[in-house]
Amino acid sequence: MAGKKRESSLQIALSNQEQWEEALSTKGLQVVDVYQAWCGPCKPTVSLFRKIKNELGDDLLHFAVAESDTIDSLVKYRGKCEPTFLFLAGGELVAVVRGANGPLLQKTIIEQLAAEKKVLNQGSERHVIKDEVLLEEEDEIAPVQAQTEDEELVPSGKSYTVAIIKPDAVAHGKTDEIIMKIQESGFEILANEERTMTESEAREFYQHRAGEEKFQELIQFMSSGPCHILIISKSEEDEDVIPAWREFIGPTDVEIAKKEKPESLRAQYGTEVLYNAVHGSNDREQASRELAFFFPNFKISNESLKELTSVKPERTLALIRPEILKERKDEILQSIKDAGFSIAMQKEVMLTEHQVQEFYKEHINEDYYPALLKQMTSGPVLALALVKDNAVGHWRNMLGPASLSQALSEAPDSLRAQFAPSDSETNQLHGSSTTEEAKKEINFFFPVEHTLATIKPDALEEHRDEILEQIQGAGFTISQIKEANLNREMAEEFYKEHKGKPFFEQLVNYMCRGPCLMMILSKENAVHEWRSLMGPTDPAEAQKVLPDSLRGKFAKSILQNAVHGSSNSDHAMEKIKFIFGDIDLDRIVHESFGETPETSASDISRNAAAQGDDPEQDESKEMEE
């Protein structure tokens, strides 16, 4: 709760026209995060604003968040998916920043605050601007607005989704045939645009899949030729088009589609996973993002917008138990993806008896508990944080009855029935029963962690702003930050585990060359997430497999590889203490995230590291450290 109070006192919430007009009368500089109801304010910038406010300590600097959907003055900002920050002074617009660009935001705040002080103290003229992006959009839309207004409106009460006929199907001349089948099946096509995506556009569109093995191949394929981008709705007003469309196109894997859904579009026109002919949005949030990406000027009726924003994506915990994890993991993960879930986090971990008792403490007195305990400690468990509209309910429905015999007899198509072991009476899949339980269970397996991150001397000098921007864009909170010049003694202690190795002297000399930027980064699963953002140690490998990683972009060599990260939770705690001293990390969690992780969650994290959950944890033995 302390975290929420602190955030609310930092940013005033504006949700109607009256509050907006009142805010315009505020003396000084007002920085307003204008957001859409479906996506909420830009959270990664909160820690930056708090840091700036604390450092400047200026009563003339104010922060606010404003919901464009409910404020008349912000009508032109509706339907924009890019974070937008308006700088207001004297009730007038003096600057605009688009995107969560931390360094640019900080620079603009400092410059505009100084300018406003000159206006107030010296009578200087205030430089008022107009939002040029909005003016350009108005110029583009005005000539055709009258004739397209009715065509560009999603009818009241209807849901919509974005569909793509991919380059393979277009190249084979199947576009008209696919469109005819779409219409014959009761779908309405509200818009149809042929478009060839650039690699940059494809990379942005599929950024949520950047960690996948075939990501680069996907980008090259999607930018290899023209696609047809469609906006699809259903004839019946009360029918949700998204699940209907996903059912119609079939499973992602073409072979599975041919076997299980032979009449689906992917079964008929796809050739393999990437070349599967068509794309469909996973959920309403993704549909809205994709609509804004391809059709930024497309209008949505107020009723449709209200329906869209009434359902918020939620998270739930899924567990794949040991008996089927080894043999059928890929099949289960594919079923999860085909159902429209996004996997936000995953962790494979060996549980101790104590951890199982803590997690299932409400089941200890049940007759089935001994068998459950034996099952849960017999091998690694895969924990997944799943994201989707009504994720808890959807996942529970897919699982079927908890009783394996009941699942087999009454719900043979449920996941528990499909993946039932031959010699066990314990079902092999778990799902949270309520949203509150999901929150607790996700926190149990994926606690808010802290890791030490370092921007090394050469990268700090050349790429500081870009690296910080990418860190904040990845959702990390920079809980502590300081620039430090390591002397030889400090550098040797920092890398003491490498003492005696051939590269030790070279590494120490390099780290003493100039200042480093030391940070405590906080996030769920922070150690693993930071290592993923850094990328492989060798920049040649990083550029090949993760070109958008920090090392893929900014590393020069294995020694000069831009950034450093702790290899596991224990290593992170040791290095944080060395750099920042005795710091209250629990207080940081409480203030930044409004909650304190369960004790058992920390145990889970340490146990995962001990079991080798992080495939890069042994990298501490290598030169990158």
UniProtKB/Swiss-Prot annotation:
Organism the protein comes from: Xenopus laevis (African clawed frog)
S-S pairs: none
Gene: nme9
Pfam family, one: Thioredoxin
Single GO MF descriptor: nucleoside diphosphate kinase activity
Chief place of localization: cytoplasm
Keyword Transcription regulation: no
Quaternary structure and interacting proteins, as annotated: Monomer and homodimer.
Function per UniProt: May be a regulator of microtubule physiology.
Superkingdom to which the source organism belongs: Eukaryota
Ranges of compositional bias, category Acidic residues: 613-625
Similarity section: Belongs to the NDK family.
GO biological process: CTP biosynthetic process; GTP biosynthetic process; UTP biosynthetic process
The protein, known as: Thioredoxin domain-containing protein 6
Region annotated Disordered, chain positions: 594-625
Keywords: Cell projection, Cytoplasm, Cytoskeleton
Location in the cell: Cytoplasm, Cytoskeleton, Cilium axoneme; Dynein axonemal particle
PROSITE patterns noted in UniProt: NDPK_LIKE, THIOREDOXIN_1
NDK: annotated span: 158-302
